[in-house]
Amino acid sequence: MQVLHVCSEMFPLLKTGGLADVLGALPAAQIAEGIDTRVLLPAFPDIRRGIPDAQVVSRRDTFAGRITLLFGHYNGVGIYLIDAPHLYDRPGSPYHDTNLFAYTDNVLRFALLGWVGAEMATGLDPFWRPDIVHAHDWHAGLAPAYLAARGHPAKSVFTVHNLAYQGMYYAHHMNEIDLPWSFYNMHGLEFNGQISFLKAGLYYADHITAVSPTYAREITEPEFGYGMEGLLRQRQREGRLTGILNGVDEKIWNPETDLLLASRFSRDSVEDKAENKRQLQVAMGLKVNDKVPLFAVVSRLTSQKGLDLVLEALPGLLEQGGQLALLGAGDPVLQEGFLAAAAEHPGQVGVQIGYHEAFSHRLMGGSDVILVPSRFEPCGLTQLYGLKYGTLPLVRRTGGLADTVSDTSLENLADGIATGFAFEDSNAWSLLRAIRRAFVLWSRPSLWRFVQRQAMAMDFSWHVAAQSYRDLYQRLKS
């Protein structure tokens, strides 16, 4: 079986969010399952530099100008690159300029990505063509539409990583993207009087996946559906919507082998985690004290991630003697709020604005609780890293957070399945009650260790997801 992933970023070549982490790990896991898997990416500068051995496969004149299709390898995975310097050779973000304005030609840049994905199924590479074209998020959303326009030369899967981003463009661009105008209607890619790349993926794909079972249910409801819930309910009734949890790349996130940690540890030597905590406290300007729980945040600072709730609940956390270490960037108001808290509570609150992949490992390895209070979270990887590192996740019960973290209720403790702390409502009071439960568990060290070991025993490796996708592909092919 031959599978082509169509996407806009891939860790570690280029990353702006969790999408890149998925594409950095899933293809290799599928190859290990015996699937001939390759990836198609735009040749953004960082990606092009990361695959210097890429060779020319073919050249083509397209609606978006002359392109060259290249093929190379990265970490054992075959990578196709769309080399179109007039579209992709721009520094910084792949999506917007230095003033944070979306590029005005994004409609062409990402239509081309979907177009090449579909052309691969008709022989753009004469020596390899996919049975399944697997498109990810709105950037690749037109791939299933182009496949439909070509008579479905391959089956298509469309994965929703975040339904909030919809790839909306004015209708007149239909004249520029090489799709028939008949596709521009309610039963097609039209949405609120515009072209929606996301809706194209949802409407034309043979099967839709979301990145967790709970998120797959949530997006059929108005609260999380962003206007697409009617179509998604229809796909659910047709058996064409599935939730498959993301995994953890254990080559990168594994406390037993993580060279970014001061002290490596395992489920059977969790006491060795203590040195990581000491060094993290020093690095963040916190009082060195192994007797108090250290809460951590590694996140974009946005209200979607619930970071305003953390700021509101912070006095209660500090009054109980806890510490907070935060790594992240985003909303300037939230940034200022956390910096002010650090200035007001030296030794108790440490803040680093920005994002550093290496330091995020030290934070995960050294803290006791990782806070993920998102208002919505399609899957979430942070809580999975927390489980892996014995850093108990404290999460809001939504999306993938609900699927992966079992609260320390009395029943779950008795059944030996508790792995963290979960709260229901998006408010500081609900968050504070969960924080209080964390302090209660912390006061019982043997019970804390028991929950830690249970958390570290959870298997969210990519091979589980790879098997689920393989089963889906086989159903589509049969």
Curated annotation (Swiss-Prot):
Residue numbers binding ADP-alpha-D-glucose: K15
Known EC number: 2.4.1.21
Pathway involvement of the protein, from the record: Glycan biosynthesis; glycogen biosynthesis
Main enzyme class: transferase
Top-rank lineage group of the source organism: Bacteria
Biological processes annotated in GO: glycogen biosynthetic process
InterPro entries the record matches: Glyco_trans_1 (IPR001296), GS/SS (IPR011835), Starch_synth_cat_dom (IPR013534)
Similarity section: Belongs to the glycosyltransferase 1 family. Bacterial/plant glycogen synthase subfamily.
Alphabetically ordered keywords of this record: Glycogen biosynthesis, Glycosyltransferase, Transferase
Catalysed reaction, written as an equation: [(1->4)-alpha-D-glucosyl](n) + ADP-alpha-D-glucose = [(1->4)-alpha-D-glucosyl](n+1) + ADP + H(+)
Pfam name, any one: Glyco_transf_5
MF GO annotations: alpha-1,4-glucan glucosyltransferase (ADP-glucose donor) activity; alpha-1,4-glucan glucosyltransferase (UDP-glucose donor) activity
Lineage: Bacteria, Pseudomonadati, Pseudomonadota, Gammaproteobacteria, Enterobacterales
Gene3D superfamilies the UniProt entry points to: Glycogen Phosphorylase B (3.40.50.2000)
Entry protein name: Glycogen synthase
HAMAP family from the UniProt entry: Glycogen_synth
SUPFAM superfamilies documented for this protein: UDP-Glycosyltransferase/glycogen phosphorylase
Function: Synthesizes alpha-1,4-glucan chains using ADP-glucose.
